[in-house]
Regions:
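Acidic/His- and Gly-rich active-site-bordering loop/insert found
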Residues: 9-148, 168-186
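C-terminal substrate/ligand-recognition segments
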Residues: 360-392, 409, 413-425
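Zn-dependent metallopeptidase/amidohydrolase metal-coordination segment
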Residues: 408, 434-503
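Acidic/histidine-rich catalytic neighborhood of metal-dependent amide-processing enzymes
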Residues: 143, 149-238
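Active-site-adjacent substrate-binding region
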Residues: 276-285, 306-310, 415-465
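Acidic-enriched catalytic cores of C-N bond-cleaving enzymes acting on peptides and small amides
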Residues: 171, 178, 212-216, 225-234, ...
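Hydrophobic beta-strand positions in extracellular immunoglobulin-like domains
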Residues: 92, 253, 374-376
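Generic non-transmembrane alpha-helical segments
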Residues: 45, 64, 68-72, 271-282, ...
Length: 505
């Protein structure tokens, strides 16, 4: 693997952006506490507005959001290009756009800040859940239900920030729907869209086409960064600066049809099994700039025991090379969910997901079809992904395997030295002086795959302070999805500080 370069650009971020104290520190504590609690109440309502995709029915959740925004005196816009697939947006005005109606919303100095979320959730089978996934159960200090983590909880945090900004306006005797929010230079846009879980074509892609002003901004913040992961007693806060793309393959493996009483090596299913084994082997670590900065941050902060396990992870070429990496080692080990995430983001991955073959129990299959889901790092092209697949299959099996790359979406990445990252680092460090802040590549896609190519830098930042024992990463699309009331309230304060740090006069 290629040696790392140093230092990373990201390591220089996080300077003190709040010399006069955090903006949230100037808010009446009673108000701050109330808004934090209301984030939990809002999340309960959003969970109960079941919006499983497919089919979506996001309009249910959109109507809840519209009502909550109207209670703040705002006049949100609604866009439903497909029946029951609703989208919502609202804008709070800053002084820059009020002074210059023709201001470019992507202007680096005065352009808008976009907070955006998706309204849909993945299905939730009741099996394995200890609560009804769509009841919005509140117990043990947590809000439980599908979407609590992905990502109605983050939307509730964003809504909490909007509530605080509206309170600023009302305290000055102003109308938050029409007047400039006191102290705000940039516009703040909150947009919630449909269909993220199945690609966004029926959601954010249509919004970009038909309601581009809902998204146009100097920078956007969305899901999946800023929450704590505890490793070897240290709190790590990954800030999402990039996300992997995807390449989906259909492999058709040929063999010879025959009677099962006379088996031989021409069995297509046997060949497919070999292909599965070869395809799924972890490839070499790819030190793209984002991964260089990530590993450098971990090396600088983690104790030797944890780093030893990380170094083994960097060197593995088969899953068996690091068979014990998922086991907890008190005082020395990284959290299992961190190791699994690192294994995924440090390289292009290839995961066999569907294998179909055979017609009867007594017939040797002459054909097998294998579906492979590949997730690719920034810089991996369609041609490179195809070439990698062919190389994995090997020259000996290549004559029997037809490789068809059926779908491709390039990875997206953003500058690691953007001003808003420094502000986010400062907001977290002001609360946690021992925080390990690092850039992260998401192993999955978000709606940033639409906004980044449209010229809107987009970072994953939905901050939560989590209990060290909480396996938050496993809650994404998992059973008993939940987030604590305390985490939501903390997230509202941190995100408010970031918004004001970036958008204030």
């Amino acid at each position: 693997r290629r040696a790392m370069s140093a230092p990373s650009r990201f390591a220089a971020t996080g300077a003190d952006h709040f010399p006069a104290g955090l903006p949230s520190g100037a808010i009446d504590p009673t108000l701050l506490k109330r808004i934090g609690a209301e984030a939990g109440d809002d999340l309960v309502q959003l969970i109960r507005a079941e919006s499983v995709n497919p089919p979506g029915n996001e309009t249910r959740a959109a109507k809840v959001l519209i009502e909550l925004l109207r209670r703040e005196g705002l006049d949100p816009e609604f866009f439903e290009p497909i029946p029951d697939r609703g989208n919502v947006s609202v804008r709070l005005r800053g002084s820059a756009s009020a002074a210059n109606p023709n201001l470019d919303p992507r202007d680096a100095r005065n352009g808008a800040l976009l907070l955006f979320a998706h309204l849909d959730v993945v299905p939730a089978n009741q099996d394995g859940w200890t609560v009804n996934p769509f009841e919005g159960v509140v117990k043990e200090g947590y809000i439980w239900g599908r979407g609590a983590v992905d990502m109605k909880g983050a939307l509730a945090v964003q809504l909490g920030v909007i509530r605080l900004l509206c309170a600023r306006a009302r305290a000055a005797g102003l109308d938050p729907a029409k007047d400039v929010i006191p102290g705000l230079r940039r516009d703040i846009i909150l947009t919630a869209t449909a269909d993220e879980e199945t690609g966004g074509l029926d959601g954010i892609a249509l919004v970009l086409k038909e309601r581009r002003h809902w998204l146009d901004a100097a920078v956007g913040l969305t899901e999946a960064g800023g929450m704590t992961i505890t490793a070897a007693g240290r709190r790590i806060y990954p800030l999402q600066v990039a996300e992997k793309g995807f390449a989906r393959f259909t492999l058709t493996v040929s063999g010879r049809w025959g009677h099962a009483s006379m088996p031989d090596s021409d069995n297509a299913l046997l060949r497919a099994a070999q292909v599965v084994e070869r395809v799924s082997v972890p490839g070499p670590v790819q030190f793209v700039p984002e991964n260089e900065a990530l590993v450098a941050a971990l090396r600088a902060a983690l104790p030797a025991g944890a780093m030893g396990r990380l170094e083994r992870l960097l060197g593995e070429t088969t899953f068996a090379d690091a068979a014990d990496l998922n086991a907890e080692a008190p005082g020395a080990g990284c959290a299992p969910e961190l190791l699994r995430a690192l294994r995924a983001v440090l390289r292009d991955t290839f995961a066999p997901t569907i294998l179909a073959s055979g017609i009867r129990s007594n017939v040797l299959p002459g054909s097998a079809t294998l579906t492979v889901d590949s997730r690719i790092l920034p810089g991996t092209t369609r041609e490179a992904a195809h070439r990698n697949m062919v190389e994995r299959i090997g020259a000996d099996l290549a004559p029997f395997v037809d490789v068809n790359l059926t779908e491709f979406g390039a990875a997206v990445s953003n500058p690691m030295d953007h001003e808003i990252l420094g502000i986010a680092c400062a907001a977290i460090r002001s609360r946690d002086g021992e925080a390990i802040l690092m850039p992260a590549v998401a192993p999955y896609a978000t709606d940033a795959k639409i906004t980044v190519p449209a010229g809107i830098p987009t970072y994953g930042f939905s901050p939560y302070l989590l209990d060290p024992k909480e396996r938050f990463m496993e809650r994404f699309h998992g059973v008993d999805e939940r987030v604590s009331q305390e985490a939501l309230a903390w997230g509202v304060e941190v995100l408010y500080d970031v918004v004001m740090g970036y958008a204030a006069e």
